[in-house]
């Protein structure tokens, strides 16, 4: 293990932008809320043997802090407030909030503590897990192989898009959490930066160092936590949407739709929300069906879909993104976030399908009932039933 003991992470900003966006909102609105989150491997990988190495990395994370140049850079962005950034300057990861164990070969990780602190663990911890596992499993793989794979795919992409008007095609890097390594992600992003259709990255550290636009708004946990923050479960999604607009009335206005299925979301997404939010993000279910529902919803509300943006980010690769672009580009603005298929795309390397999801808020259960049943997460069957009833979802498949 000592050969891999060097810290994977070197910057507090080596995380997804929406984590800081949500953290500021939590800091201002829900300072005393406590949460718990758990790690899941959606594949059949037995990762428990890496528990000691991961625990070592968790301990090392307590030494990360916001540097002065990072603080100055964040201060220049239009949506961060001084009180939050001054607090973030003093923030340190607390390893006592994380338990890591080997449960008969299964990697068991649980996070708990104040939401304002726990919220920052997910993305860097997943990136650590991914990089540590790949260091052990694929020591022969390197950056050059990742770059070669990308170059070949860009040749195919050029052939696929020949003669196609690509002026409305916008691609973002969403690859931090399941990257092969920090070095691979940086190399891939630098190469993509040479393409006119590449518009930014979700990684704040890379955005700062490479002068890119940071991309991201909110994640499932924002909606999940409101299931216990809101006094009325049936109103929890609307409460989450409203609270976000309080924090960011004119910015970061892409709403995630699948915490409790797209249909349930659209019932809550009335004309005021639809007018004020800049667009929607797809993260599960059939993307064409989802996009058609979104466009139809805007039209029903009397809103021109051309004034809104649909962001696709579920298991995309370049070919899928082009297919969706061909289908929708004449009717709505589009952006595509690609993660694993860019930052962990190396021959003979199997990417990890890993997540960390909220399971409790203030000691009570929360759930994610997405448009892909395999992505559903909740321990408490009674709460899932209550959630289905509150959102009129009698036929949704059982939580796993």
From Swiss-Prot:
Pathway: Cofactor biosynthesis; NAD(+) biosynthesis; nicotinate D-ribonucleotide from nicotinate: step 1/1. It comes from the Bacteria. One of its GO terms (cellular component) is cytosol. Keywords: Ligase, Phosphoprotein, Pyridine nucleotide biosynthesis. The modification Phosphohistidine is found at residue 220. It is an enzyme of class 6 (ligase). One of its GO terms (biological process) is NAD biosynthetic process via the salvage pathway. GO terms for molecular function: nicotinate phosphoribosyltransferase activity. Its EC number is 6.3.4.21. It catalyses: nicotinate + 5-phospho-alpha-D-ribose 1-diphosphate + ATP + H2O = nicotinate beta-D-ribonucleotide + ADP + phosphate + diphosphate. CDD domains: PncB_like (cd01401). Belongs to the NAPRTase family. Catalyzes the synthesis of beta-nicotinate D-ribonucleotide from nicotinate and 5-phospho-D-ribose 1-phosphate at the expense of ATP. This is Nicotinate phosphoribosyltransferase. It comes from Escherichia coli O127:H6 (strain E2348/69 / EPEC). The gene is pncB.
